[in-house]
C-alpha cells in the first residue's frame, strides 16, 4: 500500500523517444517553436511551462498518458487530472515552499531530465518531513527537516499533495537542453470503477448509500483527513469477499503519518463499512475500486438545467465539437443513443443531455474537497451557459435563424 510518497524508476518504455522529440525542438528553435509561459511570482516561483501536446508526437504522448492512468488506477485507485504541464527550469528558476491541498490527493513529477549528466545544482524535489517546524527539536538542519529527491530521468515521483514541497533554485546553465525538465500534474479520486458482472450504476448506488451512513459514523473525528482507496472483490452472491487498501494518506495535522488512535479508529470504521457492503447477486464476480475522502464530502449529486431554444441538431453538433476540450472539466466519455446524451466516465460519472428546450447535466457526488467540487461546478456552469448563448452559436447557425435568449440555470450543488 502506498503512503505519503512513492518512486517508480524506469516508468515509461518510450522515455527516450519523448526526450529526443524535445531535444529536436531545442536544437532547431527556428523551425520547431515551443510556446512557453513564463510563470513568475518572485515571492514563490519562477519557471517556464507549456502544454505537452505541441512538443511530443501525439501517439507517444497518448501512450504515456494511458500508461500513467493505468498505473494510477492499479496502484492508487485514483486517476490523473487531465494532461500534465511540461516544466522547464534553467539558471535562476525555482519553486518556493507551498502545498497543493486544493489540487488533488497526490502530486506527481515525471522527469525527463538528464540528471546524471546535469551541469547545474539544485532542481531536486524538496519534501518537508512530518512535524516541521517543531519547537521541541534543537539544532535541526538539512535532511532532518526535509528530503531531497533527485529528478532522475524516466522516474515517476508521487507524493501527498498536502506535504509542503519546493524545488531548490537552479544554478548553472541557461541551455534548455541542460535544464530540469519534467511533466507535472495531480491525481485525484474518480467515481467507483467497476469491472465484471455487476452494472456500474447499481454498484455506485449501493456505495453512495453506504457513504451517507459512513459519514455519520466518522463525523466526530474532526481532525482526521485524507483519502483511502479500496479494491473490492464481490462474489456472485453480492457479498464482499475481500477489501484491499491500495493507498492511504489519512492523517491528522498534529501527527502527520505517525500513529494516531483517531486515524486508526477511522481506518477500522471505513474498512468495516467497505467489507460489509451488500450488492445484488450476479452471474459472476466483480471488482470495484472505491475512493473514500475523510471527512466525507457533500454527497448530493451535481445537477444543472439550463434552457435553450436552439434546434437540437445544431446544439448537438456544437457540443460534440467542443465538449471534450473544456478547461476545468476534462470530461472523458462518449455520445450515446442519437448523439443527444454524453455519458461521462471520468473524472466523475454522469451525463449531459441535450433535450428539447433545455440542456441538463447530472453527476455523481465526487470524492473531492469542497474547492475541487466548486471549481468543477463553475466550469460546468460556464460551458452550459455558453452552449445556450447565441454568441457562441453564430458560426454554426444558418443566417436566417434568430439568436436565442439565454435561459435561467437551476442548480443543486
Model regions and ranges:
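Charge-biased low-complexity segments
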Residues: 140, 144-146, 153-156, 162, ...
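Ser/Thr-rich, low-complexity intrinsically disordered terminal regions
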Residues: 322-351
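Conserved double-stranded beta-helix
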Residues: 30-133, 162, 186, 288-299
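Short, flexible surface segments
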Residues: 121, 152-153
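Beta-strand/loop substructures that line and gate deep hydrophobic ligand-binding cavities in soluble
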Residues: 346-381
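Non-heme Fe(II)/2-oxoglutarate
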Residues: 1-73, 200-213, 225, 235, ...
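Terminal, regulation- and interaction-focused segments at domain boundaries
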Residues: 300-329
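A conserved amphipathic terminal alpha-helix motif
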Residues: 372-402
Amino acid at each position: 500500500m502506498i503512503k505519503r510518497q512513492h518512486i517508480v524508476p524506469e516508468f515509461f518504455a518510450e522515455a527516450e523517444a519523448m526526450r529526443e522529440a524535445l531535444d529536436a525542438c531545442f536544437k532547431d528553435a527556428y523551425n520547431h517553436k515551443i510556446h512557453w509561459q513564463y510563470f513568475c511570482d518572485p515571492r514563490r516561483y519562477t519557471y517556464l511551462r507549456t502544454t505537452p501536446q505541441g512538443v511530443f508526437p501525439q501517439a507517444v504522448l497518448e501512450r504515456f498518458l494511458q500508461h500513467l492512468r493505468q498505473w494510477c488506477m492499479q496502484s492508487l485507485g485514483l486517476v490523473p487530472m487531465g494532461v500534465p504541464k511540461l516544466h522547464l527550469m534553467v539558471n535562476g528558476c525555482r519553486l518556493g515552499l507551498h502545498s497543493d491541498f486544493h489540487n488533488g490527493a497526490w502530486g506527481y513529477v515525471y522527469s525527463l531530465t538528464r540528471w546524471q549528466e546535469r551541469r547545474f545544482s539544485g532542481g531536486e524535489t524538496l519534501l518537508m518531513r512530518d512535524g516541521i517546524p517543531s519547537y521541541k527539536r534543537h539544532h535541526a538542519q538539512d535532511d532532518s527537516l526535509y528530503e531531497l529527491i533527485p529528478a532522475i530521468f524516466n522516474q515517476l515521483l508521487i507524493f501527498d499533495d498536502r506535504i509542503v514541497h519546493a524545488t531548490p533554485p537552479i544554478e548553472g546553465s541557461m541551455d534548455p537542453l541542460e535544464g530540469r525538465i519534467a511533466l507535472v500534474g495531480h491525481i485525484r479520486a474518480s467515481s467507483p470503477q467497476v469491472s465484471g458482472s455487476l452494472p456500474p450504476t447499481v454498484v455506485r448506488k449501493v456505495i453512495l448509500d453506504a457513504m451517507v451512513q459512513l459519514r455519520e459514523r466518522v463525523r466526530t473525528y474532526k481532525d482526521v483527513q485524507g483519502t483511502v482507496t479500496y479494491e473490492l472483490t464481490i462474489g456472485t452472491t453480492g457479498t464482499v469477499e475481500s477489501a484491499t487498501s491500495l493507498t492511504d494518506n489519512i492523517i491528522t495535522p498534529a501527527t502527520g503519518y505517525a500513529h494516531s488512535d483517531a486515524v486508526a479508529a477511522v481506518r477500522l470504521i471505513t474498512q468495516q463499512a467497505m467489507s460489509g457492503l451488500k450488492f445484488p447477486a450476479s452471474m459472476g464476480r466483480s471488482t470495484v475500486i472505491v475512493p473514500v475522502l475523510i471527512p466525507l464530502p457533500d454527497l448530493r449529486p451535481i445537477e444543472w438545467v439550463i434552457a435553450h431554444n436552439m434546434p437540437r441538431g445544431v446544439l448537438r453538433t456544437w457540443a460534440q465539437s467542443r465538449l471534450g476540450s473544456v478547461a476545468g472539466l476534462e470530461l472523458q466519455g462518449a455520445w450515446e443513443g442519437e448523439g443527444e446524451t454524453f455519458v461521462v466516465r471520468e473524472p466523475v460519472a454522469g451525463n449531459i443531455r441535450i433535450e428539447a428546450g433545455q440542456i441538463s447535466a447530472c453527476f455523481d457526488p465526487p470524492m473531492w474537497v469542497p474547492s475541487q467540487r466548486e471549481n468543477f461546478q463553475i466550469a460546468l456552469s460556464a460551458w452550459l451557459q455558453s452552449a445556450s448563448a447565441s454568441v457562441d452559436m453564430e458560426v454554426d447557425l444558418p443566417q436566417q435563424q434568430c439568436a436565442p435568449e439565454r435561459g435561467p440555470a437551476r442548480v443543486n450543488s
